[in-house]
Amino acid sequence: MRVIASILLGIFWTITTLAQDQQARLDTLRAEGYEALYNLDYGTARNRFQKMVELAPDNPAGPQCMASSLWLQQLNQSWQLKSTLYSTGAYTEGKAQVDRKQADEFRKWVRRAKQLAQARLRKDPHDVEALYFLGASEGVEASWAAGVERKFMAAFRAGTDSVDHHREVLKLAPNFHDAELTIGLMNYIVGSLPLPTKMLVATMGVRGSRKRGLEMLERVATEGKWARDVARVLLVDLYKREKRFEDAAQMARDLAAKYPRNYLFKLQVADALTSQIVALRKAKKPVIAAEKEVQDIFASLSHDKTLDTPTRELVNVRWNIARKELQ
């Protein structure tokens, strides 16, 4: 009897150890992939995410990361982002030039992530990780529909589903702060709507608050795990919308320091500082330090030989815009 118990204990220990090893490898690949992604190295990012898919084909994490990388790359390469960076204008102006092959690839990975998450939830409706990835996949689906395809009703439906699933996550695991990202963003968006539109969506059971939305995103930015930097990227622009220019600049500085190969974060610092300088001048406050920082950023980027020609042209465009605003 003791022999059987020892064998069973050994099998259990082996299975547990293997599962822990696999999760550790998945976490490492995910971290490496996101570091590459935020440094605009899409090839390396997708290489790591593909390895996640191969290592754990039944786990929705890999497909969801693949979909996220395609979404961010599409936004970075779109003409809206080239003119407004990560601003909310990228979600409200003209139509993006969508790469059909990339769009099909995006849908494939979103579909796969949702299917895998739903399969796990059929076995265990309280599987927190599966609920999170289902909501995260719906969240990136909403972002693609709004930011890339301009299909706002589709975005609203997917976004609402994402929020519902992430609320379920927080009921089961209150400290799962990554799940607050979609909820916080939806709160801010709905809270920012004109009153008639806000009243309309309220009839659908959707309500929001800018203040509450910002608080949730700030919590993700400080206490989240995988969604921490996504929250920071969002907060840069939301702070600018709130005219909190110094907060926006500092958040962008932190991102630029962490991801030095991402020139967009450096341009975000300059953009926030330019707006801050305009406001300070109106208040007749000193602006010398901020002006110097803006000049240093553009000087550094203009001499950066790692940037390609289109990026250099973008830097020149942003510099000309900044100079006009600061005259």
Q: What are the residue ranges of the model-derived segments?
A:
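Short coil/linker segments at helix-helix boundaries
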Residues: 21-48, 58, 69-126, 133-175, ...
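TPR alpha-solenoid repeat register
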Residues: 62, 130, 179, 230-231, ...
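Alpha-solenoid helical repeat scaffolds
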Residues: 201, 231-241, 270-278, 300, ...
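Flexible, glycine-rich surface segments
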Residues: 216-274
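Terminal, low-structured helical/coil segments at or just beyond the last alpha-helical repeat
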Residues: 222, 226-228, 250, 300-327
